[in-house]
Amino acid sequence: MFGFVSDLLTAAVSSLDELLQDTPAHQIILGTAALYFLYNQYHNPSISRWYRSRNNASMKQRIIDSAYALAKNLPGVNQIIEKELNKELSSTREKLRIQRSGMTLREEIPEEGLSPQDILSAFDVDVEKCHFDFLSVTNDSPEREFLVERGDGKDSGALYAIHPKELTELLKEVYGATALTNPLHDKWPRINAMQAEVIRWCQNLFHGSKECYGLLTHGGTTSIIEAMAAYVIRARAKGIDYPEIVVPETAHAAFKKAAELTGAILITVPVDKKTGAVNPKVMSSYITRNTAVIVGSAPSFMNGIHDPVSELGQLAKKKNVPFHVDACLGGFLTAFLDTSSEPMDFRVPGVTSISADLHKYGCCPKGTSVCLFSEDSPALSVYAALNWSGGLYATPGILDGSTSGARVAEVYATLSYYGKNKYQEIAKSIITLRNAIQKELTTLLEEGNGLTSEDIYVYGNPQWSILGFRSNTCNAHFIADELEKRGWKLNLLQNPDGFHLCLTHVHTLVKGFETQFIKDLREAVIDVKNYPPGKKPSGNVKVYGAVGMMPIELQREICKQYQKARLNYTSASPGSLRIFTNVPVEEDEGLRNRKTEKYKV
């Protein structure tokens, strides 16, 4: 038997030699490598996982990353990169220094407790900025003008509500009464019942059944992570070693974070270039036996465009996969509008979970969101460790253990105070303002005024609170930069370049908001069109342009250093940020000065 096999192999090798005798060596090597790669693509899970995850990066990005991986090992390259990055980040350090100038900062907790007056003085700067946030502002109130003067009327999606003074005082009392309670324990039955009430209210808003399950979380990112973790854990329990989360390319970055934290693979699906929404037929081609969940946005953060939830629900049912609707941004806006013709919640068969932020259009204190699961959801976000030596340990949610009951109580108080009718009034006023802005822009472009729809236009067909702007003749980031000079603080977008304006209740209180915005937008576009050829970008525009030509590793390092600077107050001092630990830097003068308990930045 072995002799027969040996003869067969010898004959096969001989035939292969004859077949390839005139073939150049490099072709044989490349062909062998290609066959080996293709084999592993389908039969080696680790290679398949690497390939599918890498496939999410553009070819341009992969080339940049590969070139950097080779170049960074060359002598002196790290030092050059370090030097250039510090030049680019110098403006960030300067902004931090200016923001914190005049603040009295401490190195340690005080030895003796401070008086309430001394403690409150530490908040003076931010309290002054929020002073008018706590007034009862009506359409005829003179305080409306202050919103513009303080810049609140020109921030995109930063301040979602202006609480009446009465509600602010109520929230103070509620927090003081409940700050030390903990919903994880049954010692506070009213807090526990209140949490169940809040979750039930939200389930009803999104048309869930009484058997729905829900969590009150710290924010949209947490809600998304809870849902994704539940589905990934379920997939692994089914024997799927490398679960995949399939999302539109416009899905929030929190899904990428969730994939990295759970060890799942994030599969991004291209959206339609005209509509900005994902095509269910295209998404279908990305679903495999490893798919843990598919995702749709309602709406997306970038351009405020919602994916076709009903069609995606049908796809989920057909493919027998869970379907998560991310309504973190607009959930508590659309819930109070008539969406019966195009539902985006549990009315859609196939929807198994929804994430929605209370701290946006729900007007609740920051750090509040919900993650809801349908009655038919195959997975729930629950954690249990029943063999722990400390006893039975179980939490409603995978991430949180103990939390303050004040969060529950403040959400309960806010929702109760506003009521459905007020939320409906707010939602309608925001949509009315969005329509007014679009009408003003249409009128501007029809009248000419030196501009056409090629110079500035709203992308897609947004129906809710976000307007995404692009230009075919100008750098959209330059336009946003000019608007910033006029006091506007907008969100820059990339791939492709653009910017968006996220409307909130605050904007509806600013008299003539739409007229002022379109006036400034027109001036900004005209200024950019008159830029001299070859004008170099600066500020945020320069940062966004550089990121597009930067390796992923450096992008993450810059973000890490920026966040480190924000969270470590000493980083506001002049000095070099260290990217590579083996690169020597000069001693930071600020470090030498931190010898006393207090100092001025």
From Swiss-Prot:
Cofactor requirement: pyridoxal 5'-phosphate
Domain of life: Bacteria
Any Gene Ontology CC annotation: membrane
One Pfam family linked to the record: Pyridoxal_deC
Any one biological process term the GO annotation gives: carboxylic acid metabolic process
Top-rank EC class of the record's enzyme: lyase
UniProt GO molecular function: carboxy-lyase activity; pyridoxal phosphate binding; sphinganine-1-phosphate aldolase activity
InterPro entries (alphabetical): GrpII_AminoAcid_Decarb, PyrdxlP-dep_de-COase, PyrdxlP-dep_Trfase, PyrdxlP-dep_Trfase_major, PyrdxlP-dep_Trfase_small
N6-(pyridoxal phosphate)lysine modifications at: 360
Keyword Ribosomal protein: no
Keyword terms, alphabetized: Lyase, Pyridoxal phosphate
EC number(s) on file: 4.1.2.27
Keyword field contains Lyase: yes
Catalytic activity annotation: sphinganine 1-phosphate = hexadecanal + phosphoethanolamine
PANTHER family referenced in this protein's UniProt entry, alphabetically: PTHR42735, SPHINGOSINE-1-PHOSPHATE LYASE 1 (PTHR42735:SF6)
UniProt record similarity statement: Belongs to the group II decarboxylase family. Sphingosine-1-phosphate lyase subfamily.
Annotated function: Cleaves phosphorylated sphingoid bases (PSBs), such as sphingosine-1-phosphate, into fatty aldehydes and phosphoethanolamine. Possibly implicated in influencing the macrophage autophagy pathway.
Name this protein carries in UniProt: Probable sphingosine-1-phosphate lyase
Lineage: Bacteria, Pseudomonadati, Pseudomonadota, Gammaproteobacteria, Legionellales
